Amino acid sequence: MRQTKTGILLANLGTPDAPTPEAVKRYLKQFLSDRRVVDTPRLLWWPLLRGVILPLRSPRVAKLYQSIWMDGGSPLMVYSREQQQALAARLPDTPVALGMSYGSPSLESAVDELLASDVDHIVVLPLYPQYSCSTVGAVWDELGRILARKRRIPGISFIRDYADDGAYIDALAKSARESFARHGEPDVLLLSYHGIPQRYADEGDDYPQRCRDTTRELVSALGLPPEKVMMTFQSRFGREPWLTPYTDETLKMLGEKGTGHIQVMCPGFAADCLETLEEIAEQNREIFLEVGGKKYAYIPALNATPEHIDMMLKLTAPYR
């Protein structure tokens, strides 16, 4: 009997190919066209997206990308490639592919790469620690569309999320402790998660609960008093209410109240990207310092640290 050959697909959101208005426009068009991300009726959404949002946002977002672009590309792509390579090095007999929901390399190219390696079972690990319909759900949808076009469909193991996984919490706690050792223990540790529309949660998305699960376990692992840790939500888009409290408004409030030392961690981001390196490490730093805050430090994402790769090994082990 032929032994099953398993491959691993690491999935993440994606990134523009270049920090230019044209590349950003292509990326945003694909991203904001996904009904999992924006579910506004298409008759209303298409004219707004194509006539207003893309022309106005693309040049501005391109400038933000230019401020963080690395020699090897966007930070998300650089760190995602490092994750793929590090995991592959630990699993020499298991093909590991990287696929993005939007942009390249696509999820379809990752599936094709694994099938070309003659795998008959794929472990899909979306690198979103906390499930949301707009992230993990989008990977699930696209995977279904891809496999619907294939004559040979492999077995699939799909890891929904890992918000309270012990190895994940341990990796976050180690990262936080290293930051405390470097900068001193903060007055407040702010855990900033990407937001989603409040309506999505009202309709059943358990993302807020999974964020609370991560926060609870991390506070316990660090042994911090609960009053020294705050959970907030960032990166809201559009006019409808999103999950609260908002990160930027919370930092402004803390600075105005005289909180001197803040450290910010973004547990929901597996790799540093525009939302962490520019929005949190730069924009939100300015918000806090401008209203009287004294010390602000951003704690980097887990990226390709050994502890993060250990976590990936643990999560995928039952399916390999």
UniProtKB/Swiss-Prot annotation:
<dbReference type="GO" id="GO:0046872">
    <property type="term" value="F:metal ion binding"/>
</dbReference>
<dbReference type="GO" id="GO:0005737">
    <property type="term" value="C:cytoplasm"/>
</dbReference>
<protein>
    <recommendedName>
        <fullName>Ferrochelatase</fullName>
        <ecNumber>4.98.1.1</ecNumber>
    </recommendedName>
</protein>
<dbReference type="GO" id="GO:0004325">
    <property type="term" value="F:ferrochelatase activity"/>
</dbReference>
<keyword id="KW-0479">Metal-binding</keyword>
<feature type="binding site">
    <location>
        <position position="194"/>
    </location>
    <ligand>
        <name>Fe cation</name>
    </ligand>
</feature>
<keyword id="KW-0627">Porphyrin biosynthesis</keyword>
<comment type="subunit">
    <text>Monomer.</text>
</comment>
<dbReference type="InterPro" id="IPR033644">
    <property type="entry name" value="Ferrochelatase_C"/>
</dbReference>
<dbReference type="InterPro" id="IPR019772">
    <property type="entry name" value="Ferrochelatase_AS"/>
</dbReference>
<feature type="binding site">
    <location>
        <position position="275"/>
    </location>
    <ligand>
        <name>Fe cation</name>
    </ligand>
</feature>
<keyword id="KW-0408">Iron</keyword>
<keyword id="KW-0963">Cytoplasm</keyword>
<keyword id="KW-0456">Lyase</keyword>
<dbReference type="InterPro" id="IPR001015">
    <property type="entry name" value="Ferrochelatase"/>
</dbReference>
<comment type="function">
    <text>Catalyzes the ferrous insertion into protoporphyrin IX.</text>
</comment>
<keyword id="KW-0350">Heme biosynthesis</keyword>
<comment type="pathway">
    <text>Porphyrin-containing compound metabolism; protoheme biosynthesis; protoheme from protoporphyrin-IX: step 1/1.</text>
</comment>
<comment type="similarity">
    <text>Belongs to the ferrochelatase family.</text>
</comment>
<dbReference type="Pfam" id="PF00762">
    <property type="entry name" value="Ferrochelatase"/>
</dbReference>
<dbReference type="GO" id="GO:0006783">
    <property type="term" value="P:heme biosynthetic process"/>
</dbReference>
<dbReference type="InterPro" id="IPR033659">
    <property type="entry name" value="Ferrochelatase_N"/>
</dbReference>
